[in-house]
Structure formats: structure tokens, C-alpha cells
Amino acid sequence: MSRHFDRGSFRAVSDVHQLMSFPDFSASDAHVQWQRFNNLLWHHNDLGIWLDISRMHINAEDFERLGPRFDQAFKAMQALEQGAIANTDEQRMVGHYWLRQPQLAPDQEVCDHIAKEIDLIETFGSNVINGLIKAPNGKKFTDVLWIGIGGSGLGPLLMIRALQNAEQGLRFHFFDNVDPDGMSRVLGNLGDALSTTLVVTVSKSGATPEPHLGMEQARQRLEAMGGHWAGQAVAVTMLNSQLDQLAQKESWLKRFDMFDWVGGRTSITSAVGLLPAALIGCDIRAFLAGAAQMDEATRVSDLHSNPASLMAAAWFVAGDGLGRRDMVVLPYRDRLEVFSRYLQQLVMESLGKRLDRDGNVVHQGLAVYGNKGSTDQHAYVQQLRDGVDNFFATFIEVLEDVENIPAINNEHPGDFLDGFLQGTRAALSQGGRQSLTISMRRFDPRRLGALVALFERAVGLYGELVNINAYHQPGVESGKKAAAAILNLQSRVEDLLADGVERSAGEIHQVIGDGSEEAIFWIMRHLTANKRGYVAEGDWGIPTSLRFSKG
């Protein structure tokens, strides 16, 4: 019996009997490998994307065992898309799927809001590139300084590195950290071009410290040059946030909306990812269309015919449902070099949870790392092949090569890249090491949208399999609170030492009655290293010998 699933251009054909009786993985039997490849291969003809999980050690019994779990997972994802409170800890809907198909939103107001934002972003990007919107000095904008942390930085960085071509659109620079040296280098590289630079600050709440600090540094440098901040400043934030109110008060050049129901790590199809794409002349409609097509393909409620469920099942079995294997991401295309970092946040922030939904301590997670092939073959692939077997590889390939790099002496660089990928995949399999492969006929905005959407859905399904909330981040919030406590402690230490009296870390702790001696040592080590008038007497190798004062 055959099943045919038609979802627009999507067509998957599978023989149920064959699927349920495919042979187990064999490292040495090429015929068995070929059978598994045929039985487990998924293909989307219109997108030109293949998913091959045949080199993962999943078997027919695993599919049978996971069937009921996936039935529940598919229902949960359907409810999520219909507007259920999927993030129960924060009592929020999870609506990133609506961003590429606004008609799926639970009400017309949300649908219209999404569609309007896409139009505004597209028009703004075009007008900036074409010079209809100019810098305050009357010149065309030449650069963008993008200020954002986490998903507000990684998503835009992926869009730029993956999709920008030489001399296309504006040049991009990033403040994605609060490292003073990093900020100094970016501002130094911009130089006088800061006067023709759009400064985009991204913060959902409008109160995140890192973007605020970066924004103030950019503002100070621009105003010191005699620039006009408001005429170059753009905000991407929620309506009525602190940042939104500031932008309105100061009449910034433009404001774009973020939505309460979209988390940072799934915000790439919102203004967070679309605005940078528009500013390099990228077809944002194609990017959204690719994501929407993959969403359709991953709504199929059949484990064997849904690429996201195939991938989630392979992850689950590889790590015994406990994340016992790392995911090593190996994209064989320089444009996707940032993709492993993007997946680190998407996967690890979503799945790395201490508690399940029932309050049980589970310590779930799936570690992700990687760079790009074939570079990695000359780095850590040695350990993957011969070292500890605690991972599975995710190969990503693009079949179509660019035309302006010709064959020289009948040697095509793309042939070597393909050979290196196949060779590494084969070498890992021969060693009994697991891998899956995603292949794309070509790479463009549409395929990037599809690739992102595939992993988003796989993460959502995996979260359902292990019964965790994949849409909150209590560990991140704990880190923010701890950082705020340290900054508060530093302020109190500085207030105490303002009297000029020399004190040890222990004495400071005794007077303040908060923090710890170790935290105070760290604070004072930093302060004394930065010429703020603090001195230390004693041996830095013996912390208890040190006495601190304000000179």
C-alpha cells in the first residue's frame, strides 16, 4: 500500500510495509546502506531539498515505539499554531509560524499587523538602498551598525553572512556583545562612515542591558562627530517598551515591531531577520515563502513523511531521549558558516531544561557545535572518526556551484568539496559513527528560509517528545539576575571604598554583608586593572593578602 501526501508542491511517496521493515544500520554492508538510503530518504521536489537519516542508527522498531509519542507531538504543534498557550510558564502563545503565513494567526488583527510590518520593512529597505531615505547630512546611507544580543544578533548575522553578495546593499557591522575592545574595533572600522550609518537597536523588552550599552556608545561617538542621532537611529522592539518610548520621544528615523509571542531564537522571520535582509537588497518574500513551504511539509502528521519528525526521531534515538550525544553541524558552504552558531541557540536554549512540564528534574538538552567543511576535516574530525563516540554529525550540502569560479586544469573546486563531504560521511560510517545529511539543489533566500523552518519544527517536536517547555529560558533569566546582583555589589563596594580606607576583601564583605569575598576579589581585580583610581597592596597570587583602597 502506498501513501501520497500533497501539500501544495510537496509530494512524499512512501511504502508503509517497506518503511516498517527496513534493515538495521550496517557499517560494512553497502547493499544494506543502499536499502536504508532508499527507505529513509525524504525529498521536497519544488524546494530541491533532501533529508537522509539512513546513517543514523535508528531502526524500524524505534519508529513503532515512537509512533504514539509523535501522535501527541503533532497534536501539540497543531494546537500551538492555532494560538494555544504553548509557553505555559510565561503564559504566552508561540507564533513564529504565523510570521510567514499571517493568515494562520488566531485573529485578523494579528494577521493584518504581520502583513503590514512586512510591507513596511520591504519599503524601508528599498528606500534606503535607493537613496530615497538619506542620512542627516544629505548623503546616502552606506553602512548599518546592528546592535542586538542573542537571537537579535545571531539571526541578523546569519542573514548577512548567508545572503549578502559583494557590493549588494549596505555594509553591516555588529555590536553583539558588551566587550569594549569589540566596540572600539567596530567604531574604528566605521570611522567617518558613522555619519552615513544606520544604527539599529534591537531589544524585545527594550530594557536588556547589552543593547542599551551599545546604543549609548554609538550615540556618544556619533554626537561627538557632530552627527544627528535621531536621523540615523532605528528601533526594533515591542510596542510601548522602554526603547519604543525613547524612539518616539526623540523622533527616531524608524521603529519596527517585535511581538510578545515571538522569542528571540525564533525571531529570524520577524523584523529581526527581515530588516537586515531588506537592507542588503535580499528578497524577503522569497525567504518567507521558503519557510512557509517547509512549514507545510512539516505539518504532515505522519512520522515517516515529515522531515522534521524524521530528524527529531533520529535525535531522540541517538541520545536515548536524554541528549547523550552532541550534534556536530558541518555545512559544506562558507555562506552557512554562522549556521552552527545559530543552531546552538535555537537548539540548546530551547531544549536545555532542568525540569519537564510535570516538574520532574530531567536535565534535558542537546549540545551543538560546528564550523564548516572542509575546514573541520583538518581540525576536530579526527576525534569524530577515532575518538570518543558521543556525537552525531549533521552534514549540509549545496549541490549547485557558483559559475564565476571555473575549472582550472579540469579541476572544479566544487567537485573537491563534494568529495570531501562524501568522504568524511563514509569515513564516519565505517567507524560506526552516526550522521544525517541535508542536501539542497541550490542556495538562496528561499532555501535558507526552508532550512531554518525545518530545524525550528524539529526542535518543537523534540521538545514534545521529552515533555519540556521549548519556548522559555529560565536559565538565561537566572544569569541575568545574577549579573545584576554583581553590578549592584560593585556599586556598593565602590561606595564603601570612596572613604579612602584600605580594606581586604573579607573586611569589605563584613561591612557590606552581601555577596562573597570571592565576588569582591573579582570586582576589585577588574577595577584596579582599568585605571579608575583603585589600588591594591599585596600579592595577587594570594588573595587574602590583598588590601584595596581608592587612591
From Swiss-Prot:
It is found in: Cytoplasm. The active site is at E349, H378, K480. Pathway: Carbohydrate biosynthesis; gluconeogenesis; Carbohydrate degradation; glycolysis; D-glyceraldehyde 3-phosphate and glycerone phosphate from D-glucose: step 2/4. InterPro entries: G6P_Isomerase, Phosphoglucose_isomerase_CS, SIS_dom_sf, SIS_PGI_1, SIS_PGI_2. Its EC number is 5.3.1.9. One of its GO terms (molecular function) is carbohydrate derivative binding. It comes from the Bacteria. Catalyzes the reversible isomerization of glucose-6-phosphate to fructose-6-phosphate. NCBIfam families: PRK14096.1. Belongs to the GPI family. This is Glucose-6-phosphate isomerase.
